[in-house]
Regions:
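Hydrophobic alpha-helical bundle architecture
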Residues: 220-228, 232-251, 259
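Feature for exported/extracytoplasmic and membrane-associated proteins, marking the mature portion
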Residues: 1-212, 216-224, 243, 257-334
Length: 349
């Protein structure tokens, strides 16, 4: 992971040790919902932590959007569909794209009025979203076309491909606040490592690709003059167990490290290396040191400049008592606007 190590040395990366939550759930679907919603493991929450933030900052969305204050998408998911992360109380606050060029498909024309029925209300909503998509496609195309040169990204690296799109749109002038990308393959129940050399194998290859992609992204942002606007964060719904199983893999675990990156990150290591018991079994987990909701809350307060009382209100009942303010963002990075004015420059990926 030489790329991430280089950023760490440059003061642009942070490792948070053993991030998790109490009473972890080991189902892929349920654990993903917990991480995206910011809920406790015994709570069913149908909105996302970023969606609730965007719903606070841009009330009544999608009605009245885009507008002069916020002409751009609020959140963008690079992929085929939006996720729970950007789900607000009544609508998903984001949109998904695969590529700025192929996405652009401007359609114009008039439509018949919707009937005054429940089905008509649904049709009106669908038309509103469709119209927004057409309008947003125009600004996305313009932002993409505003960038004529980018830095080099690693070949055959899907994460790098996604981050390259994000860098292009940020540099091109989109005011979008949150971008989401994804990179899979880490569910290594078997063949996580090569039996002859456990420093190599599937897991090592995946981490190298993550490292290379993040380094290329950060370098690209720097050469385009926008690195101070962007903070990045990694997460997964699981850690892995302490001890490998009989298939040279590891099963679903509890706590895991998170990486943060950007020029405004308070770089370094947060937390201590976990103590590994000599007699650990395949069922043992790394103990949690930090609650993942504290990471979210700190970014909302210190990067998106929200008052702590507002931050607390954006989490499900009972969560605010668990939240810590963590040393993740450099002092002065927040522009101290509370509540934040629409279109502030801070971007989270």
């Amino acid at each position: 992971m030489t790329g991430l190590q280089s950023l760490f040395t440059e003061g642009k990366a942070k490792v948070i040790q053993a991030v998790g939550y109490p009473q972890p759930n080991f189902s892929h679907f349920r654990a993903t919902d917990i991480w995206m919603s910011g809920s406790n493991s015994n709570q069913e929450v149908y909105s996302g932590w970023a969606g609730r933030y965007l719903n606070y900052e841009y009330p009544n969305f999608p009605t009245g959007y885009p507008n002069t204050d916020m002409p751009d998408p609020l959140a963008i998911q690079i992929g085929s569909s939006t996720t729970l992360t950007s789900q607000g109380s009544t609508a998903n606050m984001g949109m998904s794209i695969t590529n700025p060029t192929t996405f652009y498909n401007l359609i114009s024309g008039t439509v018949d009025p919707a009937p005054a029925t429940p089905a008509g209300k649904e049709l009106t909503y669908i038309r509103t979203v469709n119209q927004q998509t057409q309008q947003y496609s125009t600004v996305i195309k313009a932002a993409a076309n505003a960038v004529t040169q980018q830095g080099a990204y690693p070949a055959n690296n899907s994460l790098g491909d996604q981050l390259k799109i994000v860098a292009r749109l940020v540099s091109g002038g989109l005011k979008t606040r949150v971008y989401m990308v994804n990179f899979g393959g880490f569910d290594t129940h078997s063949v996580q490592v090569n039996a002859g050399d456990t420093t190599t194998g599937t897991h090592a290859t995946l981490l190298q690709r993550v490292s290379d992609a993040i380094k290329a992204f950060q370098d690209d942002l720097k050469q385009m003059g926008v690195e101070d606007r962007v903070v990045g964060m990694t997460y997964s719904e699981f850690g892995r167990r302490i001890k490998s199983n009989s298939s040279t893999g590891t099963d679903h675990g509890a706590a895991a490290p998170m990486f943060l990156f950007g020029s405004k990150i308070e770089a370094g290591m947060l937390g201590v290396n976990p103590t590994i018991p000599a007699n650990a079994s395949v069922n043992d987990n790394i103990p949690m040191q930090y609650d993942f909701r504290s990471v979210y809350a700190t970014l909302l307060e210190k990067w998106f400049c929200l008052d702590k009382t507002i931050v607390d209100s954006l989490f499900p009942p009972g969560i605010n008592a668990q939240l810590q303010s963590l040393p993740l963002i450099k002092a002065g990075a927040c522009n101290t606007v509370t509540p934040p004015a629409p279109g502030n420059d801070e971007v989270l990926i």
